[in-house]
Amino acid sequence: MAKTGEPMKAKLGAAPFSDPDWVFERKLDGIRAIARREGDAVSLTSRTGKNLSPSYPELIEALAAEPADDFVADGEIVAFDGSQTSFAKLQGRMHVKDPRLARLTAIPVFLYLFDLLRFDGHDLTELPLRARKGALRRAFSFHGPVRYTAHRNEHGERFFREACDKGWEGLIAKRADSAYSHTRSGNWVKLKCGREQELVIAGFTPPQGSRQHFGALLVGFYEDGELRYAGKVGTGFDHRTLAELGAKLEALEIPEPPFAAADLPRLARWVRPELVGQFAFSEWTRDGKLRHPSFLGLREDKPAQEVVRERPEA
């Protein structure tokens, strides 16, 4: 099956805005997925090219049932907790690699498509976004677990207030006349209701009291080629997460800290900086540390070397 470049990514926005030349979509709290079909060959891949198909057999079946048999579409795989997309709930499917076991999890998943990169042998990436979204809507039947990502035109500030009031993660603003570029671009902008950050896990502290497996994660981000320490995270774990993540950490242990020179916790244990987590937090301190961080889940779709501190763009 032919490959395409990595997916287009959004930059972090400083504040919501309204503009008739932009469209605004709901920011879904899931994992990015590229859906491909060439004849009978159907696949889902992550933004790093990892095969996601075994974890989501019902999505593969739904894509195979579409009349269209030649496409590349961009979207997000999500699970719901009530009316909210839940990255935490999706964790129960992300790490299951056997299709039979994936079905037994009883966690329904959905694929929300928002862009069409190729259709019927034609490359659409140079077309304006509005034209691509129009083609996407016509190309798929959007029944069952495959769904269309709706958008609003122009009134971004009002839509953002509504999104935050509903408990959504935020919005993605997209320039309506923009082409699809396989990079991070200011033509797509993330507008977040809360604050989240992807961070590299590079160590942990021993458990205390009744806690088992580990106490807190030691996390950081890359800056100027070095791994910068961003603090420790001791909340957001249930018993199962502590056990599963603890086993992963033990397998990655190394003797020396991978962080650049910093004031690091005593008695810490270090791991190869390969695992990437998603974390919620209240703010950054002046010295580049997280305030009130909480673990949301592991990200298997992000290389550790690409993790940098997200800074709002004006």
Tell me the role of every PLM-derived stretch.
Residues 1-314:
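Catalytic cores of nucleic-acid ligases and guanylyltransferases
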